[in-house]
């Protein structure tokens, strides 16, 4: 048995190997999405397929599914050899989306399979229907590129299989260069691992790893034991797109029993022929990410962390998709799953949670031919937004959130203009984007990119363009994401559905405008300190009209408290429906509809002073002169009183048609 000190040293040594891998990736990769965007992750996996080491900087949705990828590999291949490596990106068997390709490098000790070194990185293109492979228009996974389900290739990197892969993707020179960089990094990581084995012995190293996994398990069990037993349900929503007709939902029931947690996603929308699906590894990733972040943020993540947690996501839902469902927007689904689990634990520990984050990756691709450099190009960016406000501080602005690892906010202007036929015209924080609250949500950003080549194509895969990130404990929602193209200074239509653009033709001089959402607010905005409101106004983060949300106003440049009448908020009496309508459908009285400007299909928010806000869509308007809202009995558990604050979210539900998704 290894000693406590030896185990601690081994833990840090393994993490050091992974950190060195990360630094080498940044220094040696060819594509800017790696060396500027940090869209990659590195981990060490043991021979049983268990995650044993990561750097603390890696992306959760990269590293947690890796264990599932390797478990699949072990089931598929019983003849793994020391000269083999494997490529994996298949979302149905532990992958994320097709662009995220994992290189799995086995390590043998005395002819025994000992460990796997894994680097999962985003390839700029993996084939498919559009430059960059990701788009809002995919209807099946074949539209998104090549599926690689643990494809065996030699460690030398020379094979007809690899040639076939690189011959069928765009900008293959970037992918080839990055791939060979990964091979070199894995070789060095194997050398570092062998030195560690030589120093402590293979037996002691395995004993230390076993103790590390057990320690992670004990930490998570202790955190869960502090929570009251019970069942806590919540539903989060995605915008959806044309095939889904109206918002998709991720429903979760989180059951806490002693030192265990079980998340049941029954009630989640069925998979759809659109890129808003995720494979089976994503639901456990969301549950672990939220529980770890809010209950035990210290300490490393290993497969031991997941042992007290069980997850059920029904097959053929957007959280457990099967072929041929496209999964390019798996991160949009993951953000919704994160929000659902966050809404569940906000009912348990409302004082410790935050408002929601921007809720999407905002995949943005501009691709075409660069005549000046005489080659094809693909510019890929995912503009970050605001994070949620919390008990003691405002959210952060234009940064990656806690559930995104070390990925950077945006690529630098200098690098973009040096290697692409593009000009960056504007980078700034987006006014009025952070959700109002006692502690405001962080601001999103505004980024304008001008096309400087004769023609190009734009694809966008985003969410939360209709349904904004929610606040908590009475805090308000952040502004939704927004994408548009300016031609001759005027906006032009680029898609039938917000945030879903497929290969839209751009001309020289067109300007792509990306506006990312802000985070949700924490606590009632009327409780915000006036000095903070003054600072926000002076900094341009809150405009004069938006001061009303804080119970403030501006006069002659002076911000002061004052009586304000909010046009988007009203107190309403609750009446309970006696039909079988789902929880997200509600009725409102004619008086409330007139007060808030609601019509059939309008979306509303039910603000809870303690815990998460709820979302609903108006399916009928009742006669009545009093402000009332007619809710499903399924929501009774959220309400102790007979009134609720109702806010208009300003968005319309595309359709309420019999037989459509609910």
Residue ranges, per PLM feature:
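Glycine/proline-enriched, intrinsically flexible loops and inter-domain linkers
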Residues: 1-82, 90-109, 113-567
């Amino acid at each position: 048995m290894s000693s406590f000190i030896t185990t601690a040293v081994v833990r840090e040594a393994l993490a050091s190997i992974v950190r060195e891998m990360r630094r080498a990736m940044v220094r040696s990769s060819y594509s800017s999405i790696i060396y500027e965007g940090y869209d990659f992750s590195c981990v060490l996996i043991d021979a049983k397929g268990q995650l044993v080491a990561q750097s603390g900087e890696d992306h959760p949705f990269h590293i947690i599914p890796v264990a599932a990828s390797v478990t699949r590999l072990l089931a598929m291949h019983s003849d793994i050899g020391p000269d083999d490596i494997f490529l994996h990106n298949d979302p149905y068997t532990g992958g994320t989306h097709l662009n995220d390709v994992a290189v799995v490098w086995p390590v043998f000790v005395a002819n025994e399979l000992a460990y796997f070194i894994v680097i999962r990185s985003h390839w700029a293109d993996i084939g498919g229907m559009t430059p960059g492979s990701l788009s809002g228009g995919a209807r099946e996974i074949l539209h998104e590129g090549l599926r690689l389900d643990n494809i065996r290739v030699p460690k030398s990197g020379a094979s007809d299989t690899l040639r076939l892969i690189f011959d069928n993707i765009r900008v293959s020179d970037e992918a080839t260069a990055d791939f060979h960089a990964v091979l070199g990094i894995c070789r060095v990581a194997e050398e570092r691992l062998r030195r560690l084995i030589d120093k402590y012995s293979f037996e002691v190293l395995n004993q230390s790893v076993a103790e590390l996994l057990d320690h992670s398990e004990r930490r998570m069990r202790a955190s869960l034991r502090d929570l009251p037993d019970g069942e806590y349900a919540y539903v989060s929503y995605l915008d959806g797109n044309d095939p889904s007709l109206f918002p998709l939902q991720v429903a979760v029931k989180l059951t806490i029993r002693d030192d265990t947690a079980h998340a049941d996603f029954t009630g989640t929308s069925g998979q759809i022929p659109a890129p808003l699906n995720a494979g089976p590894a994503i639901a456990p990733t969301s549950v672990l990410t939220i529980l770890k972040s809010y209950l035990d943020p210290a300490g490393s993540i290993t497969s031991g962390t997941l042992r007290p947690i069980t997850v059920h996501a029904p097959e053929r839902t957007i959280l457990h998709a099967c072929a041929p469902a496209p999964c390019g927007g798996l991160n949009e689904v993951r953000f919704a799953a994160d929000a659902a689990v966050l809404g569940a634990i906000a009912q348990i520990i409302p004082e410790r949670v935050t408002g929601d984050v921007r809720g999407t990756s905002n995949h943005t691709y501009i691709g075409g031919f660069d005549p000046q450099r005489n080659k094809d190009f693909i510019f890929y960016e995912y503009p970050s937004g605001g994070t949620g406000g919390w008990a003691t501080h405002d959210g952060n602005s234009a940064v990656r959130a806690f559930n995104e690892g070390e990925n950077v906010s945006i690529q630098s202007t200098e690098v973009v203009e040096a290697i692409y036929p593009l000009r960056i015209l504007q980078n700034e924080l987006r006014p009025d984007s952070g959700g109002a609250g006692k502690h405001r949500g962080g601001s999103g950003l505004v980024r304008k990119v001008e096309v400087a080549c004769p023609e190009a194509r734009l694809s966008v895969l985003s969410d939360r363009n209709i349904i904004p990130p929610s606040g908590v404990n009475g805090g308000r929602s952040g502004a939704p994401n927004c994408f548009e193209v300016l031609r001759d200074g005027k906006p032009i239509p680029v898609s039938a559905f917000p945030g879903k653009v497929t290969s839209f033709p751009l001309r020289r001089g067109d300007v792509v405008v990306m506006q990312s959402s802000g985070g949700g607010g924490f606590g009632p905005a009327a409780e915000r300190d006036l000095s903070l409101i003054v600072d926000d106004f002076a900094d341009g983060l809150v405009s004069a009209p938006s001061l009303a949300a804080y119970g403030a106003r501006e006069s002659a440049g002076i911000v002061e408290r004052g009586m304000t009448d909010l046009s988007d908020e009203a107190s309403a009496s609750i009446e309970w429906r006696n039909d079988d309508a789902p929880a997200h459908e509600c009725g409102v009285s004619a008086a409330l509809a007139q007060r808030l400007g609601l019509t059939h299909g309008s979306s509303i928010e039910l603000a809870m002073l303690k815990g998460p806000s709820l979302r609903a869509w108006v399916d009928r308007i009742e006669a009545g002169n009093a402000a009332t809202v007619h809710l499903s009995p399924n929501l009774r558990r959220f309400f102790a009183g007979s009134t609720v604050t109702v806010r208009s979210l300003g968005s319309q539900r595309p359709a309420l048609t019999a037989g459509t998704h609910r």
